[in-house]
Amino acid sequence: MNDPREILAVDPYNNITSDEEDEQAIARELEFMERKRQALVERLKRKQEFKKPQDPNFEAIEVPQSPTKNRVKVGSHNATQQGTKFEGSNINEVRLSQLQQQPKPPASTTTYFMEKFQNAKKNEDKQIAKFESMMNARVHTFSTDEKKYVPIITNELESFSNLWVKKRYIPEDDLKRALHEIKILRLGKLFAKIRPPKFQEPEYANWATVGLISHKSDIKFTSSEKPVKFFMFTITDFQHTLDVYIFGKKGVERYYNLRLGDVIAILNPEVLPWRPSGRGNFIKSFNLRISHDFKCILEIGSSRDLGWCPIVNKKTHKKCGSPINISLHKCCDYHREVQFRGTSAKRIELNGGYALGAPTKVDSQPSLYKAKGENGFNIIKGTRKRLSEEEERLKKSSHNFTNSNSAKAFFDEKFQNPDMLANLDNKRRKIIETKKSTALSRELGKIMRRRESSGLEDKSVGERQKMKRTTESALQTGLIQRLGFDPTHGKISQVLKSSVSGSEPKNNLLGKKKTVINDLLHYKKEKVILAPSKNEWFKKRSHREEVWQKHFGSKETKETSDGSASDLEII
């Protein structure tokens, strides 16, 4: 930000001048002054040649001091001849009588309309002639296009763009020679020249705008019937930004290699007004366009102070990336204002009675919010037509904030919602009730699992005896004994223990069964291996070899195989 108290040198390219100060306007003014001088000289000659006769009425005027007696004058012959002599030679009286005798025009005359119409036609012809003469004097390329220069490392202030450069692509003398007869318009001056609502091109035969490249897009194609290549890059002076569109295959191939941070001059670009889609027919701002094949961009040097805003967006987790002047600022204007508001909110003496209200609609943008596009500085707020019902509905649904608390939370990171603090006791009570219900459910689950594990309390004596006989018959098969573990997880022992104890077994068979059951119940194996043993593996291998020798071996060395082996066992 420039300090108004600082005394700076006069910059001729920073002052906004009128369009009449160009060379053609000065030449026309000199021509008009020459014609005026000639007219005045001729008028002076006529005045000198013609001597105005004296009026006899003013030769001798006598004012009587007091009333006198009226006397009858006797006219003489000489006096009559003298009066007739001067009557015909009085030019003033003759001219006055002629003007009085002319008929006056009626009140409803069209003389003013006709004069205005004729003047309009004359002005139009003058504008056409002026435009033709301006186009005849226009050039489309710089005079240094065919020369090749070696970049020069430097650290100086470039006079045409008022930007510091660390490298020059063209010497300063050659640059001044190339831009000698070209009007230089910086971005601030260009926005003052190209004004709404018409956004007409500046009235200069040759003009160029200067700035540094801060953004460059990818190559795209237009959506017309015959697609055309184009790309866009943005130039800036750290205060204003402007988009430049390059159309055409040759232009894209020539200018797509422009580097970010280069200071360039664009000669006589076309002004391209644009309007936002779906927001009426009014023109909002303008861009620049190059659609011809001439080389009209001159690379001056590489900027020294170009940088990017390093502030990270909390939602997207990406850096801001807005171009900044690293010699003056550490972040962009938007984040500087956010930091200023965060700092001023902590100081009571800086807080006013009324704060800047947060936007409730998309169209209402306070000074804190930067426009979404990069031409936010050039917003033209004009009258808009009434929107349709569907557009009004979409407009109402596009709110930035749901309520005022959300807006305050957006501006202040330490903001606490008062509604949340008021309901804090209710939330704490709900959390305690949830913990108690979870503990109660856990205890009830333990009790239910304990009752389901036994399941013999509600059984009758007959049912218990039946379950015992079924369990003993299952144990007699030896399947569970070969497994090496209890698959029922102890339920067999509970069934056998809870059954009715009868008399001692009458025969040895029942005693043996009881002994086997007890051994099985008390049998525990530390490591259970379900894979076949080594002996079983060797038996299978030898059996496989015997079968192979039988069918594919030599007939002399036939070996008899076991009768239990079959051809189906060959893999």
UniProtKB/Swiss-Prot annotation:
GO terms for biological process: DNA replication initiation; DNA strand elongation involved in DNA replication; double-strand break repair via break-induced replication; mitotic DNA replication; silent mating-type cassette heterochromatin formation; subtelomeric heterochromatin formation. InterPro entries: Mcm10, MCM10_OB, NA-bd_OB-fold, Znf_Mcm10/DnaG. Keywords: Cell cycle, DNA replication, Metal-binding, Nucleus, Phosphoprotein, Ubl conjugation, Zinc, Zinc-finger. SUPFAM superfamilies: Nucleic acid-binding proteins (SSF50249). GO terms for cellular component: chromosome, telomeric region; nuclear replication fork; nucleus; replication fork. The modification Phosphoserine is found at residues 18, 453-454. Changing residue 268 to D/I: Temperature sensitive; loss of CDC17 stabilization. Residues 309-335 are annotated as: Zinc finger-like. A motif (Bipartite nuclear localization signal) lies at residues 435-451, 512-527. It is found in: Nucleus. GO terms for molecular function: DNA replication origin binding; double-stranded DNA binding; single-stranded DNA binding; zinc ion binding. Residues 435-512, 453-553 are annotated as: Sufficient for nuclear localization. Its main location: nucleus. Diubiquitinated in a cell cycle-regulated manner. Ubiquitination first appears in late G(1) and persists throughout S phase. Changing residue 320 to Y: In mcm10-43; abolishes self-association and diminishes interaction with MCM7. Residues 451-473, 548-571 are annotated as: Disordered. Residues 451-471, 548-561 have a biased composition (Basic and acidic residues). The modification Phosphothreonine is found at residue 17. Self-associates; assembles into large homomultimeric complexes of approximately 800 kDa. Associates with the MCM2-7 complex and the DNA polymerase alpha:primase complex. Interacts with ORC1, ORC2, MCM2, MCM3, CDC54/MCM4, MCM6, CDC47/MCM7, RFA2, CDC45, POL1, PRI2, POL12, SIR2 and SIR3. The diubiquitinated form interacts with POL30/PCNA C-terminus. The zinc finger-like domain binds a zinc ion and is involved in self-association. PANTHER family: PROTEIN MCM10 HOMOLOG. Present with 1860 molecules/cell in log phase SD medium. Belongs to the MCM10 family. Required for DNA synthesis. Required for entry into or completion of S phase. Involved in DNA replication and seems to participate in the activation of the pre-replication complex (pre-RC) and in transcription elongation. May play a role as a key coordinator in assembling the replication fork. Proposed to function at replication origins following the binding of the MCM2-7 complex prior to the recruitment of CDC45. Probably is required to stimulate phosphorylation of the MCM2-7 complex by the CDC7-DBF4 kinase complex. This is Minichromosome maintenance protein 10. It comes from Saccharomyces cerevisiae (strain ATCC 204508 / S288c).
